[in-house]
């Protein structure tokens, strides 16, 4: 087995997306990089249906984040607490798509970000939240709020402020076009650092096997 795993851009805009060739109309590998002295690249991040572990891994790059902020400016992100998303060069999306709000946020990121990355297992394939896909949504709600052990004041929440759940949890490439996939539950801080620095530098992204294996 090779000790280096290359990540190439994805194709398509449906559930058939796979890491392979550059999609028509999308940036070529390295197109995000800007030669010469230019303004910092803008990066946005968000967490959909997940555990926030991928953002914790982003913070696990430790003191290297000081080097990262020399290269990029963070726009909307839980890290910055900026709520409104402006035009960005790079969007990192953690988590699967489980409710109507997730769909809205994800589509907003796709509209505003030149390059969109599925960050972590939940964004790539649905992850742990997608385990409910084996059951009907009604059965999940009943078990959680009505018939489960230790339930007090049973009843399925029906507040209009609560986003409506989708019947299934989807990986993000089933909703929007994705340019890169970075797997892991979560991907390590080292993997995120390698991915970001090579992408921002316009280099082919090659991650050592030690940064991606989970055996």
How does the language model describe each region?
Residues 2-15, 22-215:
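Iron-sulfur-associated redox domains of electron-transfer enzymes in respiratory
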């Amino acid at each position: 087995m090779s000790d280096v795993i290359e990540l190439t851009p994805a194709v398509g805009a449906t559930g058939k997306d796979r890491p392979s060739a550059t999609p028509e109309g999308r940036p070529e590998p390295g197109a995000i990089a800007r030669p010469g002295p230019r303004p910092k690249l803008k990066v946005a991040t968000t967490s959909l249906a997940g555990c926030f572990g991928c953002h914790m891994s982003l913070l696990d790059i430790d003191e290297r984040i000081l080097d990262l902020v020399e290269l990029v400016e963070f726009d909307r992100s839980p890290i910055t607490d900026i709520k409104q998303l402006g035009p960005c060069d790079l969007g990192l999306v953690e988590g699967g798509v489980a409710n109507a709000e997730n769909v809205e946020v994800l589509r907003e990121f796709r509209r505003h970000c030149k390059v969109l990355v599925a960050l972590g297992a939940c964004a790539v394939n649905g992850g742990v939240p997608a385990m409910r896909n084996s059951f009907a949504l009604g059965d999940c709600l009943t078990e959680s709020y009505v018939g489960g052990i230790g339930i007090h004041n049973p009843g399925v929440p029906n507040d209009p402020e609560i986003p409506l759940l989708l019947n299934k949890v989807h990986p993000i490439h089933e909703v929007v076009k994705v340019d890169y996939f970075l797997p892991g539950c979560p991907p390590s801080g080292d993997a995120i650092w390698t991915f970001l620095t090579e992408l921002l530098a316009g280099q082919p992204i090659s991650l050592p096997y030690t940064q991606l294996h989970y055996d």
